[in-house]
Swiss-Prot record:
The protein's name: Glutamate--tRNA ligase
Main location (coarse class): cytoplasm
UniProt GO BP: glutamyl-tRNA aminoacylation
Superkingdom classification of source: Bacteria
An example Gene Ontology CC term for this record: cytosol
Source organism of the structure: Lactobacillus delbrueckii subsp. bulgaricus (strain ATCC BAA-365 / Lb-18)
Gene Ontology MF terms in the entry: ATP binding; glutamate-tRNA ligase activity; tRNA binding; zinc ion binding
Catalysis: reaction(s): tRNA(Glu) + L-glutamate + ATP = L-glutamyl-tRNA(Glu) + AMP + diphosphate
Pfam families registered for this protein in UniProt: Anticodon_2, tRNA-synt_1c
Residues bound to ATP: 262
Keyword ATP-binding appears in the UniProt entry: yes
Amino acid sequence: MANKKIRVRYAPSPTGHLHIGNARTALFNYLFARHNKGTLVLRIEDTDTARNVEGGAESQIENLHWLGIDWDEGPDIGGDYGPYKQSERKDIYQKYIDQLLEEGKAYYSFKTEEELEAQREEQRAMGIAPHYVYEYEGMTTDEIKQAQDEARAKGLKPVVRIHIPEGVTYEWDDIVKGHLSFESDTIGGDFVIQKRDGMPTYNFAVVIDDHLMEISHVLRGDDHISNTPKQLCVYEALGWEAPVFGHMTLIINSATGKKLSKRDESVLQFIEQYRELGFLPEAMFNFITLLGWSPVGESEIFSKREFIKQFDPARLSKSPAAFDQKKLDWVNNQYMKTADRDELLDLALHNLQEAGLVEANPAPGKMEWVRQLVNMYANQMSYTKQIVDLSKIFFTEAKYLTDEEVEEIKKDEARPAIEEFKKQLDKLDNFTAKKIMDAIMATRRETGIKGRKLFMPIRIATTRSMVGPGIGEAMELMGKDTVMKHLDLTLKQLSEAGIE
C-alpha cells in the first residue's frame, strides 16, 4: 500500500443537505489528496432507497463546490472507475455476492424480521448482547437446501449473510486512533451483505467500491469504527488487501459538551443554512478544517493553498472537536474585512431583498446607496444577514427613543448638545459625512460640551442606537430630512419627560 498512488474518496448518501460533519470529512479527504498530489473520488452511496431524498445528490455537489472542494472523478464528471453511484453498480455487487455464495462464505437467510426481533428480545432478557444466531446449526447440506426451498415456496424473500469466522481478531493501525482490534465474536454474528430487495448493504458495497476504485486511504468519522471489522471480514473473504483507515473524532457542541446531533437545534449544522446567512465559503472552509486538525504555529486564518501545503493526517486530533459558533462568527468577520466588496454587496443585497427592505431590481442610485450601506457595516458584521437588523433605522419611520436610550441620554448634557447640533445641521447645504462631522465640532465649540457627553446624545438622537458605524457616514446615508425628524422627535420626547 505504501507505494500506491494516494486515492481517497468522499462518499455521501443523498439523504439531505450537507452537514457540518460530512463537510469536514470531504475537506480532510480533499486536503489529503491535494497535499499528496493524489486523486479525490466523489461517490454517491444511494443503496438505502428509503432514506434517499430527491435532489439530495445535486444538493451535496452544489454545496461542496460552494465550499471550494473539487474532485477528480465522480458522477458529474466521470472517470475510469465508474459508475460512481452505487445504485448503478448492482450488477457489480451481484458478481461478488455470487462468488461468496459459491465458495460457501455466504448463505441465504430466510429468518423474518419478527423472528429476529424475538431472538434479540430473548437475548436481552438473558443479559446477552443481541446477535444473530446461525439458523442452520447442525443441519446437513441437503437439509439446508430443503429448508431454503420450503421458505421460497412460502413466498419468503431471503437476505444474504456472510459467515463470520470464529476466533479471528480484526485489527488495523488507524492513522488517527492508533492500533485498534475487535474479536470476531463481538461484531454481532453473521451480518447481512444483501438485502431482501437485492440491494447490497453498506458494509458490503463500500468494500467492493473501495477495492475496485483502488482507494488507498479511508478517512471518515469515528462513528464508522464499528463498521471497520465487518468490512475487514469482507476483505478477507474476497482475498483483498484493505486500505489504510483513519477515523476522525466526533464534533461536539461547545456550549453543551454533547455530540453535535442533527436533533440539536441550538446550533445551525448545515452548510446551506450558513450560505443563507451570508457566511463566506473561504471562512467556512477555514473554520471546518480546524475542527479536529491542528496546523503548525498559532495562526488561525489560512488560505486554501496554505492548508494544502500543511495538511498532515498525523495532526488530526484524538480528542473531540468543539464546534463554537462564536469562533465561527469571528473567523467569518476576519474574512469579511478583506473580502471583495462586490461579493459582500451581492450577499447583503440578497438578505435585504429577502427581508423586503430593498426592491428586486433597484435603480442605479439605490444600488450605490446599498453599496455604501454594506461598506459601512462590513467590518462590524459576522455575516451579511446581520445587516437586516443593523440597518433597520435606515428603512423605518422616525420613532421615539426606547426607555434605555432615554436613561442613557439623562446621564449627559443632552438637550443643549442636541439643540445646537440641530442648528448646525440646518445650515448645511451639502449633507456629507465630512460636513456632518464639522457640524459636531461646531457644536462642541458653541456649547463647550465634548467627548462622550457630546457624541453619545447625538448618536442616540439621530441613529436610535448607542453603538454603530461612523456617525457621519450613518447620517449621510439616512439623509438630512430623516435626521432632522429624529432630532425633532427626540427634543419633543425630552420635553415630555421633563428633561431640559
